[in-house]
């Protein structure tokens, strides 16, 4: 019984013999790299690259949803990457002063 289920998974349209499986597995590297980069100082973050990764992941989330059969593994991968990259982008924007509040800017210097 377990062997037949495993055999069915191997030969399915989303199984490990297809790019539908290995593409998302390889893309988890982007998520891992983003998580590792959270330990680095915000000055090391590239705003352009983080923005590009946000657009890339948003586009591929839509692709993963629209392709038949739906690729939930790819969708989860890019949703995770979108979250990580938006956090990195916010760290970069805060370090560049784009997210400072008006109260901080209006404080008189002593």
UniProtKB/Swiss-Prot annotation:
This is Mitochondrial pyruvate carrier 1. Mediates the uptake of pyruvate into mitochondria. Pfam families: MPC (PF03650). It comes from the Eukaryota. The chain crosses the membrane at residues 20-36, 44-61. Keywords: Membrane, Mitochondrion, Mitochondrion inner membrane, Transmembrane, Transmembrane helix, Transport. Belongs to the mitochondrial pyruvate carrier (MPC) (TC 2.A.105) family. InterPro entries: MPC. The keyword tRNA-binding does not apply. GO terms for biological process: mitochondrial pyruvate transmembrane transport; regulation of stomatal movement. One of its GO terms (cellular component) is plant-type vacuole. It comes from Arabidopsis thaliana.
């Amino acid at each position: 019984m377990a062997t037949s289920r495993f055999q069915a998974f191997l030969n399915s349209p989303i199984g490990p013999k297809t790019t539908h499986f290995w593409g998302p597995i390889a893309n988890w590297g982007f998520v891992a790299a983003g998580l590792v980069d959270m330990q680095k100082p915000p000055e090391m973050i590239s705003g352009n690259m983080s923005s590009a990764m946000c657009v890339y992941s948003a586009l591929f989330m839509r692709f993963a949803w629209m392709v038949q059969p739906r690729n939930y593994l790819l969708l989860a991968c890019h949703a995770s990457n979108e979250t990580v990259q938006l956090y990195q982008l916010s760290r970069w924007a805060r370090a560049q002063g784009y997210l400072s509040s008006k109260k901080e800017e209006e404080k008189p210097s002593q």
